[in-house]
């Protein structure tokens, strides 16, 4: 058995192979790419003829080099860069480092402390596609918020009443209206019927368009502050550019959402996930993508809670004890469970009871929601492990049994 450390980068990778005694038996660099990966595999086979004879340590989970070695059947283990930094001090206190030395540190850390590191596993086809799509959606939503904020700032400067005409700046009717009439002077002269036709063109129904047109016309007739002429002349071009960006983002979001629906439909955990309170068609794909279809890759529910960030971190020394918020986790799973908990306390009896109990004891809103999220994680782990959908009646009856026997 040999242990291999890979200090990876975008352009090249440093390898170090150590034997079971910690002796460095081979070190080399390869360029990033298929040819380089195959060279590395060929050199490793001289010391580990079978992939089962080698353990590999690396500081990334998402990379082509990870995909390559997982596909060949190697056992890959992820080390957090913070962990590697601590292991580096075990060998050198001077702080000196190099790519080759870091590769050796990774290999030796895996040799001595393998039990501390999580083994990486290739995601199933459904989860991998969903992960790419849901993360793409997340990025588009962030871009949408950024563009909306820029639009808000621009309109406040020269056309503030536009912010009061619609419920938000990410609506088709807003884009259609402001592209056609980007200044107050142009919009003020519009009749109710003209505004109505613009809103209809944007896709609003006859009744809604008529009601909105009257409201918009009324607000446009109110006295407004007059900005400098140069400001009014310059800003419309910037606003139109932002509006076109917003339209592009909305179109991309629609396309990505359709692909998410198509790929999520066949995911093996879809029905199980959506049986839980608070988890529906929006949060389900995120959890399916980030957790994968095989829940057994988490050793137990405690490991899953740490992964999701719902379990706190305890610092204890002598008389000192402090419970802290867990920051090292999968933020997407944490956010999904936070939103699911918010939904669950409005629709699920036990979730509401738990939330109200903790709030009455003086616990904060966030602390109470995390307690609900912890319960959801326990249920999620159980139903995915047993392949049985969640049943609220069964859950409540089991709680009654446990409270009676305890």
What annotation goes with each model-predicted range?
Residues 1-406:
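A detector of single, family-specific signature residues
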């Amino acid at each position: 058995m040999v242990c291999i450390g890979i200090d990876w980068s975008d352009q090249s990778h440093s390898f170090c192979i150590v034997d079971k005694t910690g002796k460095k038996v081979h070190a080399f660099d390869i360029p990033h790419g298929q040819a380089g990966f195959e060279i590395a595999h060929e050199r490793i086979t001289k010391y580990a003829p079978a992939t089962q004879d080698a353990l590999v340590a690396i500081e990334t989970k998402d990379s082509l080099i990870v995909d390559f070695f997982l596909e060949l059947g190697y056992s890959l283990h992820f080390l957090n860069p913070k962990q590697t930094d601590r292991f580096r001090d075990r060998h050198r206190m001077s702080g000196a480092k190099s790519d080759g030395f870091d590769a050796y540190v990774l290999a030796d850390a895996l040799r001595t402390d393998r039990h501390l590191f999580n083994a990486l596993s290739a995601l199933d086809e459904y989860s991998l596609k969903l992960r790419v799509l849901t993360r793409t959606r997340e990025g588009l939503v962030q871009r949408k918020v950024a563009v909306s904020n820029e639009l808000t700032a621009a309109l406040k400067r020269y056309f503030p009443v536009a912010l009061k005409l619609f419920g938000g700046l990410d609506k088709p009717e807003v884009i259609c209206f402001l592209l056609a009439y980007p200044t107050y002077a142009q919009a003020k002269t519009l009749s109710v019927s003209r505004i109505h036709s613009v809103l209809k063109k944007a896709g609003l129904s006859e009744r809604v368009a008529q009601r909105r047109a009257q409201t918009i016309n009324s607000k446009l007739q109110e006295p407004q502050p007059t900005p400098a002429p140069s400001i009014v002349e310059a800003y419309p071009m910037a606003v139109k550019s932002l509006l076109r960006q917003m339209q592009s983002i909305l179109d991309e979001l629609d396309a990505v959402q359709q692909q998410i629906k198509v790929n999520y439909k066949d995911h093996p955990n879809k029905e199980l996930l959506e049986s839980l309170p608070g988890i529906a068609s929006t949060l389900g794909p995120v959890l399916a993508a980030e957790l994968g279809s095989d829940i057994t890759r988490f050793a137990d529910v405690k490991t899953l809670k740490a992964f999701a960030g719902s379990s706190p971190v305890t610092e204890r020394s002598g008389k000192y004890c402090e419970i802290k918020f867990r920051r090292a986790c999968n933020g997407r799973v944490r956010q999904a469970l936070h939103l699911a908990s918010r939904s669950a306390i409005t629709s699920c009896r036990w979730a509401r009871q738990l939330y109200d109990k903790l709030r009455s004891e003086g616990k904060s809103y966030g602390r109470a929601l995390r307690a609900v999220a912890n319960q959801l994680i326990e249920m999620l782990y159980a139903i995915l492990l047993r392949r049985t959908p969640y049943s609220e009646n069964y859950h409540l009856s089991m709680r009654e049994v446990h409270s009676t026997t305890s």
